[in-house]
């Protein structure tokens, strides 16, 4: 299975949402689209969580140098 990119999954999710919001799909097709949307949303969420863990902030020190600090959310 090929590795999917976040941007590709997000585009697929947006397409699914557009189809579902159109309200023209038969029930069975709506269910299939919904399942695909859930799959794409979970993938995007996972990728965002992974990216968040990798974010680092560069903070300028008083001496002009930079120090790395791991990104932390306030609720952690």
From Swiss-Prot:
Q: Name one GO molecular function term.
A: exodeoxyribonuclease VII activity
Q: Which GO terms describe its cellular component?
A: cytosol; exodeoxyribonuclease VII complex
What Pfam families has UniProt attached to this entry? Answer: Exonuc_VII_S
Does the record carry Phosphoprotein as a key word?
no
InterPro entries referenced in this protein's UniProt entry, alphabetically: Exonuc_VII_S, Exonuc_VII_ssu_sf
Which keywords has UniProt assigned to this entry?
Cytoplasm, Exonuclease, Hydrolase, Nuclease
Annotated EC: 3.1.11.6
Q: Which reaction does it catalyse?
A: Exonucleolytic cleavage in either 5'- to 3'- or 3'- to 5'-direction to yield nucleoside 5'-phosphates
Could you tell me the superkingdom of the organism this chain comes from? Answer: Bacteria
**SS bonds (residue pairs):** none
Q: What Gene Ontology biological process does one annotation of this record name?
A: DNA catabolic process
Q: Where in the cell is it found?
A: Cytoplasm
**How is the subunit organization of this protein annotated in UniProt?**
Heterooligomer composed of large and small subunits.
* NCBIfam families, per the entry: PRK00977.1-4 (NF002140), PRK14066.1 (NF010669), xseB (TIGR01280)
Q: Which HAMAP family match?
A: Exonuc_7_S
Family membership noted in the UniProt record: Belongs to the XseB family.
Task: Say what the protein does.
Answer: Bidirectionally degrades single-stranded DNA into large acid-insoluble oligonucleotides, which are then degraded further into small acid-soluble oligonucleotides.
* Protein name listed in UniProt: Exodeoxyribonuclease 7 small subunit
Write the gene name: xseB
